[in-house]
Amino acid sequence: MMIKLIATPSNALVDEPVSIRATGLPPSQIVTIKATVKDENDNVFQSQAFYKTNEAGEVDLEKTPALGGDYVGVHPMGLFFSLKPKKAFHRLMKKDVMNSPFCICLDLYDSVNWLETVRIPSKASQRVQRWFVGPGVKREQIQEGRVRGALFLPPGKGPFPGIIDLFGVIGGLVEFRASLLASHGFAVLALAYFAYKDLPEKLQEVDLEYFEEAANFLLSHPKIQQPGIGVISTSKGAEIGLAMACYLKQVIATVCINGATTTTAVPLRYQDLVVTPIQQALERMEVHVSGAVCFRHTTQYLQNKNILPVEKAQGKILFIVGENDELLDSKLHAQRAMDRLRRHGRSSGRMLAYPGAGHLIEPPYSPLCFASWQPVLGRPMCFGGDLMAHAAAQEHSWREIQKFFRKHLLQSGSKL
């Protein structure tokens, strides 16, 4: 019988699960399945797991437990979320979402194949294309007034619920989450706010009027549903997203993923208001055994007076926190914000805390990025996360994020 490696679907969105099966092998055979992908800079990411075939000579990743490798146990998508960079401290992140997918090569070997120095030919291979954009989604480059970014629109006439997508100190324009959400029926503006085109090269301050201009632009678009928009935000972006929720009436639903609930590093300005950043206790910074810097404890001693005025938020706020976040004690920050809401008699906040999850909680099946190189620091920064717990958090939170936006952005009678 011919040995086969079957992966279905072989062409799908990155948040869709893939079924992987090996057939035509001898019974009780130890096999290796490897996954390999290159990013747009030719950095290689790889994972592997060792399995034992059943009496029919088959391995089904939905049923067969991995005996060893990058994970152990039954994890149908383990080869995807356990991908690791061959060169340390690289992060797998799609830049050109419209024109190409990540192409993941799956290879099957009929032995334990783990030595890089020994080349063994694979018995079967399969390619899987993982897209960040679905059929019919359109991308519009945005350069309106001061606003710089990319707007992703789902197929159809609309109007669609509108969302602004913000990332952190990575800067530039990050589009992969916006394009993926647009593939699920949301109109999403991936918004740059520094280190992009004619925007400031460095983040010297957060000018909230820039983000208000972006919110007004989005609401003025003919395909955007009224009366308000959502914000999805991560890290420094989540700090800005929370400030938008507090001060901008246009924002009615905000998702803050592992962000500070204070102003950090640089001041925040809005009209006549200036919010100075809290001081970080840099002497509490720790260095991980890998050499990556952990900032988790540098903002632990924040005072309640430093918390952004969440009670002023006119919309709903969803805090998503990883309890193993090594960049920020994000659970403490979110708890302080929730406490402030309660003291003001507000029930507009909700917190989802994930034990074992790290800082970079991304769409399902994204590889855990425990640490990555930060040019600004000249060394790697630690994000934390336990592989299995982090993967579970990404799956669950992605569903909850979409449910949250559907509930609070859609008018009664609308369908999505």
Curated annotation (Swiss-Prot):
Instruction: Kindly list the cysteine pairs connected by disulfide bridges.
Output: none
* Intervals of motif Microbody targeting signal: 414-416
Gene3D superfamilies referenced in this protein's UniProt entry, alphabetically: Acyl-CoA thioester hydrolase/BAAT N-terminal domain (2.60.40.2240), alpha/beta hydrolase (3.40.50.1820)
In terms of one coarse class, where is the protein primarily found? other
Which of the residues bear the PTM Phosphoserine?
125, 414
Q: In which tissues does this protein get expressed?
A: Expressed mainly in liver and kidney with low levels in adrenal and little or no expression in other tissues.
Localization per Swiss-Prot or TrEMBL: Peroxisome
GO cellular component terms listed in the entry, alphabetical order: peroxisome
Catalytic-site annotation from UniProt: 235 (charge relay system), 325 (charge relay system), 359 (charge relay system)
Superkingdom in the source lineage: Eukaryota
State the reactions this protein catalyses.
Answer: tetracosanoyl-CoA + taurine = N-tetracosanoyl-taurine + CoA + H(+); eicosanoyl-CoA + taurine = N-eicosanoyl-taurine + CoA + H(+); taurine + octadecanoyl-CoA = N-octadecanoyl-taurine + CoA + H(+); taurine + hexadecanoyl-CoA = N-hexadecanoyl-taurine + CoA + H(+)
Top enzyme class of this protein? Answer: transferase
Instruction: State any GO BP term from the record.
Output: acyl-CoA metabolic process
This protein's UniProt keywords: Acyltransferase, Fatty acid metabolism, Lipid metabolism, Peroxisome, Phosphoprotein, Transferase
EC number(s) from the headed UniProt entry: 2.3.1.-
Q: What does this protein do?
A: Acyltransferase which efficiently conjugates very long-chain and long-chain fatty acids to taurine. Shows no conjugation activity in the presence of glycine.
Q: Can you name this protein?
A: Acyl-coenzyme A amino acid N-acyltransferase 1
